[in-house]
Amino acid sequence: MVREKVKVSTRTLQWKCVESRRDSKRLYYGRFILSPLMKGQADTIGIAMRRALLGEIEGTCITRAKSENIPHDYSNIVGIQESVHEILMNLNEIVLRSNLYGTRNALICVQGPGYITARDIILPPSVEIIDNTQHIATLTEPIDLCIELKIERNRGYSLKMSNNFEDRSYPIDAVFMPVQNANHSIHSYGNGNEKQEILFLEIWTNGSLTPKEALHEASRNLINLFIPFLHVEEETFYLENNQHQVTLPFFPFHNRLVNLRKKTKELAFQYIFIDQLELPPRIYNCLKKSNIHTLLDLLNNSQEDLIKIEHFHVEDVKKILDILEKK
């Protein structure tokens, strides 16, 4: 069998932000380039990045509203200019930023007459509003309006499925997509077989994160998808005629985890709680959510186990190890 040689660029790949602007509180734009790439690589990366940007990044939305004033979602309330449906649509458009996990409660409690805007939402500490001026409703008479809200962090979108409003609670269509649009284009340069490519990537976000933050998060998510292919402890790849065997490496931090287990007795581990480790809040919340409460629980998990935890990244393992090795 004849195999063609595959040319690989010896130049270091570099990325750069060539344009960044804020068109409004709820519209950010960024343009990035990555080069030099071999022919075909730019399209491969561009397609994967666009899908990750639009589908893999989490966002925070209001997903449910509840009020004793609301009989049903297409009704009108005396003293309020907007219909209930319009109020729910306005709540749907509120842009939020958070690092929360699970569901949180928020509240609107206003006395009319006056305008209700996003500024009037009483939020939990982990959530912030991007644009306080977003309109919710107009109270035309001196009435009290209280609306309980549910806030969630997720990815993709969630369409309301239930029409059962017996508890006066109304689901809201949620679009958990901070990236509003993403495009890629390719510029080729060079002659003949020496042609190389530059990838141009354009990103528009809703202001809950910048295009640069979106690019970093999408990249991390793609890396996490491919990491399982790098972790094969016992398996080997057999090449043609079984002449050579190549064993795939452990996860990069595997040996550090093993050494930590050897250094300290398990008896001590079970009395050290992760609360004492001064971990970053996001990492701490991920571990607690996975029923990891002590150092023994933590070290009984391999790196492969840890990165399977929702919202957990490879660099989080390094951060944990750095903290543990200083203790």
From Swiss-Prot:
GO cellular component, one term: mitochondrion
Enzyme Commission code: 2.7.7.6
Entry-linked CDD domains: RNAP_alpha_NTD
Region (Alpha C-terminal domain (alpha-CTD)): 264-327
Keywords: Chloroplast, DNA-directed RNA polymerase, Nucleotidyltransferase, Plastid, Transcription, Transferase
Self-association and partners: In plastids the minimal PEP RNA polymerase catalytic core is composed of four subunits: alpha, beta, beta', and beta''. When a (nuclear-encoded) sigma factor is associated with the core the holoenzyme is formed, which can initiate transcription.
Name of the protein: DNA-directed RNA polymerase subunit alpha
Species whose genome carries this gene: Capsella bursa-pastoris (Shepherd's purse)
